[in-house]
Curated annotation (Swiss-Prot):
<keyword id="KW-0793">Thylakoid</keyword>
<comment type="similarity">
    <text>Belongs to the Psb28 family.</text>
</comment>
<dbReference type="GO" id="GO:0015979">
    <property type="term" value="P:photosynthesis"/>
</dbReference>
<keyword id="KW-0604">Photosystem II</keyword>
<protein>
    <recommendedName>
        <fullName>Photosystem II reaction center Psb28 protein</fullName>
    </recommendedName>
</protein>
<dbReference type="GO" id="GO:0031676">
    <property type="term" value="C:plasma membrane-derived thylakoid membrane"/>
</dbReference>
<keyword id="KW-0602">Photosynthesis</keyword>
<dbReference type="Pfam" id="PF03912">
    <property type="entry name" value="Psb28"/>
</dbReference>
<dbReference type="InterPro" id="IPR005610">
    <property type="entry name" value="PSII_Psb28_class-1"/>
</dbReference>
<dbReference type="InterPro" id="IPR038676">
    <property type="entry name" value="Psb28_c1_sf"/>
</dbReference>
<keyword id="KW-0472">Membrane</keyword>
<comment type="subunit">
    <text>Part of the photosystem II complex.</text>
</comment>
<dbReference type="GO" id="GO:0009654">
    <property type="term" value="C:photosystem II oxygen evolving complex"/>
</dbReference>
Length: 117
C-alpha cells in the first residue's frame, strides 16, 4: 500500500509506514558527520497484520531511496511498542541529501521542525 506522498518511509518494500516518527538529529562539531534517530510509537510495521522480517528502513522521495539497516524494536511489558531506526551520515553530501529528504517528508506530512539551543 503506497501513498501519493512525495516522501515516505517504508519498513516493508511497497508498504508505506503511516505513523510519523519523532526525529532527532545529532552532528559533529564540524558538521560533516552525524546521525538521525527515528522513533516510531506503535508503528503499523509492528502490528499483528504485518508479516515478514524488518531488515531496514527506506526513506523514499523523488530523488530516490536512502536505506538504513540499523533498526531495533523496543518492548514494553512484553509487547513491541517502539521502533527505533538510526541513519548515520559520514560526509556533507550525505547530510545534504538526508536534509532534502527530511524537508520533503515534513512537507508531505504537514510537519515543521525546531532546534534546541
Amino acid at each position: 500500500m503506497t501513498s501519493n506522498k512525495t516522501a515516505k518511509i517504508q519498513f516493508y518494500e511497497g508498504t508505506d509506514e503511516p505513523v510519523v516518527p519523532e526525529i532527532r538529529l545529532t552532528r559533529s562539531k564540524d558538521g560533516t558527520t552525524g546521525q538521525a534517530l527515528f522513533l516510531f510509537e506503535k508503528p503499523q510495521a509492528l502490528s499483528s497484520i504485518t508479516d515478514g522480517e524488518i531488515t531496514g528502513m527506506r526513506m523514499i522521495d523523488t530523488e530516490g531511496e536512502i536505506l538504513t539497516r540499523e533498526v531495533k524494536v523496543k518492548f514494553v511489558d512484553g509487547e513491541p511498542i517502539f521502533l527505533e531506526a538510526v541513519y548515520i551520515w559520514k560526509n556533507t553530501p550525505d547530510f545534504d541529501r538526508f536534509m532534502r529528504f527530511a524537508n520533503s517528508y515534513a512537507k508531505s506530512n504537514g510537519l515543521g521542525y525546531s532546534e534546541k539551543k
